[in-house]
Structures are given as structure tokens and as C-alpha cells.
């Protein structure tokens, strides 16, 4: 089992949700208006010069096949997206248990 955290600018949540739908994933936990800064990207602080924020989705995968499709789709989308700041990020971790 795997746990994935997906992070993107709030502006691009619709395209991220489209990727989930295309991969057959209809389960997630979502946090909106998340503040932060990635390596080599602009801050997303929700105010001032850095007024944007991020969205974070947490998805638990018992079956890793949809995760593989999602990763492929994110890599394709990111390759087509010029600005690194606009890329979708996926962080994958082992998941020991779902209760």
C-alpha cells in the first residue's frame, strides 16, 4: 500500500481533479489555501506579492495500479507545463495500515 500527497497551486486544482478522474480515483482528502514554498519555486503565502496558495490532496492506495497511472499522467502534464512553479508535485510514502 502507498500514501501519496499531491501539491499544486490552487489555480490548477481543476486540472489535478481531471487527472484523478482519468485514473479512476474518486477518493482523497483535500486541504485548500495551504501556504508554503518549494525548492526553486515562488512562495505561496496567500498575501502580498505572493498571494496564491496551494491545494494538497492525500490519497491512500490499497491497489497501486491507479497510482502508477496517476504518476504517468502527472509526469506528462508537467512535461507540457513550461513554468516549474505550475507543476503538480507528488510525494509517495509507504502505507502500513488503513483502519
Where are these regions (language model features)?
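Positively charged, small/polar-rich N-terminal and surface patches that mediate targeting and assembly
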Residues: 1-99
Amino acid at each position: 500500500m502507498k500514501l501519496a500527497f499531491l501539491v499544486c497551486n490552487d489555480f490548477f486544482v481543476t486540472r489535478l481533479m481531471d487527472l484523478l478522474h482519468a485514473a479512476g480515483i474518486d477518493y482523497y482528502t483535500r486541504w485548500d489555501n495551504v501556504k508554503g514554498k518549494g525548492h526553486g519555486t515562488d512562495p505561496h503565502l496567500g498575501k502580498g506579492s505572493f498571494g496564491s496558495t496551494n491545494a494538497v490532496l492525500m490519497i491512500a492506495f490499497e491497489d497501486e495500479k491507479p497510482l502508477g497511472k496517476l504518476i504517468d499522467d502527472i509526469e506528462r502534464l508537467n512535461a507540457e507545463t513550461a513554468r516549474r512553479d505550475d507543476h503538480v508535485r507528488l510525494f509517495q510514502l509507504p502505507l502500513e495500515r488503513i483502519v
